[in-house]
């Protein structure tokens, strides 16, 4: 099992990552932008803390945009890059394409075991399960 901190608060990441109990970080570019920051600058700051797995979300609904942006982020940030895509038909298609190129993928918005199986079959290395809306 791996534990990922779901935040872009660099100070908080530094505190928790330093415990040795956190395996990586997941981020949300929409929330980063709302805070007035640039997502790629935040990724750079997180990387400087020594975090070796950052899930970088791409906001699109087109598998080829996921692929294009995923390649660009992998080129820029290297081995710390994991691309975060939703468990949608386009997200799963992108997962398959990215993973075939050796780019790690974290599939999010998983609400059922069936979705987890689909994401695994598409090549996801991480699955982010969401709480059931009924919980």
Task: Enumerate the language-model features and the residues they cover.
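Structural preference for beta-strand elements that scaffold enzyme active sites
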Residues: 2-4, 24-26, 53-55, 80-82, ...
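Conserved small/polar residues in nucleotide/adenosyl-binding loops
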Residues: 128-135
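Active-site beta->alpha loop and helix N-cap motifs at the rims of alpha/beta catalytic domains
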Residues: 9-12, 19, 33, 38-90
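The catalytic core of metal-dependent phosphodiesterases that act on cyclic dinucleotides
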Residues: 98, 106-107, 111
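Conserved, mostly hydrophobic/aromatic
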Residues: 28, 83, 119
């Amino acid at each position: 099992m791996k534990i990922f901190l779901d935040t872009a608060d660099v100070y908080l990441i530094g505190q928790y990552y330093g415990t040795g109990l956190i395996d990586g970080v997941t981020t949300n570019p929409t929330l980063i932008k709302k805070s007035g920051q640039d997502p790629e600058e935040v990724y750079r700051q997180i990387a400087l803390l020594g975090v070796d797995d950052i899930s970088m979300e791409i906001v699109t609904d087109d598998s080829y945009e996921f692929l294009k942006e995923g390649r660009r982020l992998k080129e820029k940030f290297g081995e710390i890059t994991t691309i975060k895509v939703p468990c949608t038909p386009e997200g799963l298609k992108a997962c398959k394409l990215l993973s075939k190129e050796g780019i790690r993928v974290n599939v999010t918005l998983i609400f059922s075991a069936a979705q987890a199986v689909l994401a695994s079959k598409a090549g996801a290395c991480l699955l982010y399960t969401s709480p059931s809306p009924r919980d």
